């Protein structure tokens, strides 16, 4: 019966489709317009705020607005330079590398990123009988590093300073979240009573991710039960 859905189908593809985070979206639109007018990549950007408030969604939407490729990595998996290097070497001109949970990178990986972010260069130590200890510097395309964190206080000042744009994401208010619930329930072909819709909004605790997960479960439940409309 296909009881599950790709939750990416519920994710907005453009900034204009994003509900909530109004001030952040307004500033991002300005940044994007400026970058595109200069035929340049977006400046390095950091998002911080509670889990599930749209950091990855914003990265996807920005990539679509910029018309560029997007790579997604998780800081928890970037323990060594070897872990990070494939992502860095695959960046394209004006592309985006998004690192979620960037606060979980190790210090050695963070320090490796400094020249990458500042000069778009990869500095690698090389060894050999005649060149032991020398450093090879490789130019890479200009790209945007995006970081996302729920723990801003865990980031070092040198790393924070290398992000030209910093945006705080907040929990969604009831009106914004209610609208998200109403829109996404229609995408899932899920008919709910007003009371059921309000209940989903309430239990989602200001977080679209929780709301979408609840809607998916309710969609599956409705199909399994064979009911048309869900009430509270």
Predicted features by range, described:
Residues 61-62, 81, 95-125, 152-162:
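Conserved AAA+/SF3 P-loop NTPase catalytic/coupling segment centered on the Walker-B
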Residues 198-202, 209-224:
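C-terminal helical "lid" of AAA+/P-loop NTPase domains
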Residues 33-75, 87-92:
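Walker A/P-loop
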Residues 128-148:
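AAA+/SF3 P-loop NTPase mechanochemical coupling elements
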Residues 19, 46-48, 99:
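Residues at the beta-strand->loop junction immediately N-terminal to the Walker
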Residues 6-44, 85, 89:
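Pre-Walker A (pre-P-loop) alpha-helix and adjacent loop at the N terminus of AAA/AAA+ ATPase modules
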Residues 70-81, 127:
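Short beta-strand-centered segment that lines the nucleotide-binding/catalytic pocket of NTP-utilizing
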Residues 154-187, 194-199, 213:
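Conserved AAA+ ATPase core "coupling" helix
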């Amino acid at each position: 019966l296909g009881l599950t859905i790709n939750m990416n189908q519920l994710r907005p593809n453009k900034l204009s489709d994003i509900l909530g985070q109004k001030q952040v979206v307004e500033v991002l639109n300005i940044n994007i317009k400026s970058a595109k007018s200069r035929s340049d990549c977006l400046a390095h950007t950091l998002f911080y705020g509670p889990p599930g408030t749209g950091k990855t969604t914003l990265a996807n939407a920005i990539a679509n607005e910029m018309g560029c490729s997007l790579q997604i990595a998780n800081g928890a998996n970037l323990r060594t330079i070897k872990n990070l290097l494939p992502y860095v070497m695959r960046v394209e001109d004006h592309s985006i590398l998004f690192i979620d949970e960037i606060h979980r990178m190790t210090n050695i990986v963070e320090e490796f990123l400094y020249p990458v972010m500042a000069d778009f260069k990869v500095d690698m130590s090389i060894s050999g009988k005649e060149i032991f200890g020398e450093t090879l510097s490789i130019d890479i395309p200009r790209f945007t590093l995006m970081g996302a964190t729920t723990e801003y206080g865990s980031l070092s000042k040198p790393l924070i300073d290398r992000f030209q744009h910093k945006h705080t994401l907040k929990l969604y208010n009831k009106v914004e979240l209610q609208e998200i619930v109403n829109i996404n329930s229609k995408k899932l072909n899920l008919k709910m009573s007003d009371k059921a819709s309000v209940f989903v909004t309430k239990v989602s605790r200001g977080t679209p991710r929780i709301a979408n997960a609840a809607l998916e479960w309710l969609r599956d439940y409705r199909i399994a039960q064979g009911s048309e409309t869900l009430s509270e």
